[in-house]
Amino acid sequence: MHIGMIGGIGPASTVAYYQRLSAAVRDAGGALDLTIVNADVNELLRNNEAGDKNAQAIAYAKLIDRLAAAGAECAVITSLGGHFCFDDTVSLSSLPMISAVTPLDAYFAAQGFKTVGLMGTKIVMNTSLYGQLSQTKALAPTDTLD
């Protein structure tokens, strides 16, 4: 399967996804078929701060179209912070989308966790991971940090 990654939002997470995918495919005896496009982190930050899910989903849809043109069969956003408009992106995407939140939620539930602590960006914490956890509850710090 040719995977399309929207990277560049958090370069460290893009690298981590690449390394883990590459190792998993190699260990399975295959070769990784992957295309990465770089998202504009400044655009993402503006849209995230403004809560403009539609504008960011449109930006992602354009990147996903590039991934599809390169032969990708699915797409993933390589940053949890970039998932604030995931549902909107799914509705505009020319490719099936892979959520980074869904496997986290499933893992927590499989481990028997009903509630998990959450650390992340202000918006991630204020929305309990954008309300995308369906099997577990998220608790985040509520105090304002100086």
Where do the language-model regions lie?
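Non-catalytic structural scaffold of enzyme domains
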Residues: M1-D146
